[in-house]
Amino acid sequence: MFTTTPDPHDIDEGALEVHAPKTAAAGVKAVAVALERGMAQAGVARTVRGMLRINQRDGFDCPGCAWPESITGKRKPAEFCENGAKAIAEESTVRTVTPEFWAAHPIAELEGRSEFWLGSRGRITEPVVVRPGETHYSPISWGEAFELIGEHLRATTPERCVFYTSGRTANETAFLYQLFARSLGTNNLPDCSNMCHESSGFALNPTIGVGKGTVSLEDIHRSELVLVVGQNPGTNHPRMLSALVECRKNGGKVVAVNPLPEAGLMAFKDPQALGGIAGGGEKVADEFLQIKVGGDLALFQALGHLLLAREEREPGSVVDRHFVEAQTAGFAEYREARRALDWAETERATGLSRAQMETVAEMMVASKATIVCWALGLTQQRHSVDTLKEIVNLLLVQGNFGRPGAGACPVRGHSNVQGDRTMGIWEKPTEAFIAALEAEFGIPFPREHGYESVETQHALEAGEVDVFVSMGGNFLSAASDTEHTRAGLKRTGLTVHVSTKPNLSHVAHGRTSLILPTLGRTDVDDKHAGGRQFVTIEDSMSVVHRSQGRLRPVSEHLLAEPVIVARMAEAALGEDHPVDWRAMAEDYDLIRDHIARVIPGFEDYNRRVRTRDGFVLPSPPRDTRTFATDIGKARFTVSPLEYLTPPAGHLILQTLRSHDQYNTTIYGLDDRYRGISKARKVVLANPEDLAALGFADRELVDVISVFNGDERRAEAFRLVGYPTARGCAAAYYPEANVLVHKDLVARESNTPGYKALTVRFERRQ
């Protein structure tokens, strides 16, 4: 039970409790937990004010996931989920981290704390600094902090500076931030999308001409078939469950594909409906395929084989011939590649039976409007890009683009991670984008590609980064190969963290380090000559809308993110720089005016975003059934079969979230749906696998990963028998990120292979 004062004790891993997994998500318990966390963190009045404004048209966008709100119908009074409420509680908390906290806790002590303990201390109230040789952070004025940043940036060269971005950064901040980095002379703009959905962009851009999804929320409601693959919506996007249930009520079918039988894939107890309060909830998945980790490519190739075999037997029954002939290229090669299939190998790769795959293929044949949704279970494998291209193949075969209820749906994890990329947070900017920036601001910008996240890790470790700036986020805990990343960050001359709460990146600091406290989504932003400001967000379905904080900040010393970026830029580039940084920081309309002239789709930005529901960005595949690829058509592709085969004595491990966390932010210690509580250093593995390997349930082990002859070790994890797919295991991140070698990445996208670890266990002595 939380109290209004944070618990002084850290996690006791020996207190682990294990209960039977749940078979339904949400319900009354979710409401109770949401209210409990909010009131304990922020008090009754502040919690109620916040919850009434979450995801409402006159409120603020939830800082959690990127799931959209309806733009066609009435919104529910509670337009948020349990984990959204936890995110708001974390941000609107009245707990504070004051100078007294930093004075009482040396950095060496904080380095040994967990993310849960650090985050639960509260909101940082004023800027702090640690200088070479010092053991504690101590207060610094804003003016001195910006002067220090300017000195370090001017003392080095642009290619030795890195500007990292978290996915919850709003559009206005993101645009200003990339403009700052490029004005300085670098495209070193890694962001969290490099570590999650980068594979989606690398698969979608060359095949359909856009790196985003092609469906709306209403499309899911009216789809005839939705495949939910490599995704746990009950924890990561709980409001998606309402959409899936609505789809089924309208006659659609849902297929879930996942290595773990997650509660949210089975049933949903809608707490705003009578059935969710008194009954067993609504069924979510009509079919559940418990696939092996990494077996999805084999599954989609098998489905392609089955669809084309049906078309060959019954011409016209499957393939949208007019669409394929007029709007695509490469179909003949794809058809030939899928003509033959080794069923024994396919069953071995997937862990599924042929009959299961044939059932799903029949559902696809019967559907005239199919959507495939996916998340990180598909994007963080060595062969992720090929897997996602195979999904595109399946959608193209039946013409499932540009029609109601059909399309591709990569479900983004973090609110505005998609918007950040749209705003130019990308290490590989297009010539068109750079040319538009130059035309707008009248100064030259660099063309040479910069570092993405994994390349940043390599540069840090090589001592090639002098200044590392983090706009939100927690790079140390989000990145792979934790110990190597920690060592790399400590080699920098200056680390700068724009943050709301303490995290472990703050204590893996450069020789000099600054923590700059900022306003959050919930906070009123009104310290401007131009009056109260709002920001804008792009959700997972390309809807751009406004977000305006409504709660009083916990400290008068906090600055808004655009103000922080502008003042860093002035300190580094001088007040006589051609870009009027200060004016944009005072009036965000000016930032949006620049965006409107630089980025296609944002014309008349300030007017359109002030309308009732904002506006939807253009998507040629969705809007006009056209594809802006280099050949002007959608592209079928052919990929070889690939899957994960662990050596004897090993399992394939994936990292995942608990139900009580969001990315690297740990809300609590209750993974309620999986029945794991009070501890986090656990490995979930099939009981039959544990027995075959000679281990017992609850045994304490070290976990060793193997990649290219290198080993990584995670110490003192508890084995828990769990109904995972055979040959597979799972552990929470960030604790398990230490096992992910930085060179274990997806081909093309360079996304870390968090879902592709070959591991073995060693008993603790």
Predicted features and spans:
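Glycine-rich loop/turn
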Residues: 113, 117-131, 654-682
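Long, low-complexity segments enriched in small/aliphatic residues
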Residues: 583-672
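Short, solvent-exposed secondary-structure boundary/capping segments
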Residues: 723-736
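Long, low-complexity intrinsically disordered regions
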Residues: 748-765
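Intrinsically disordered, low-structural-confidence terminal and linker regions
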Residues: 1-65
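Low-complexity, highly charged intrinsically disordered N-terminal segments
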Residues: 88-136, 146
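Short, non-ligating residues that shape and space the ligands of small metal-coordination modules
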Residues: 71-72
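Cofactor-pocket helix-loop regions in the catalytic cores of large enzyme subunits
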Residues: 2-30, 122-415, 423, 438-622, ...
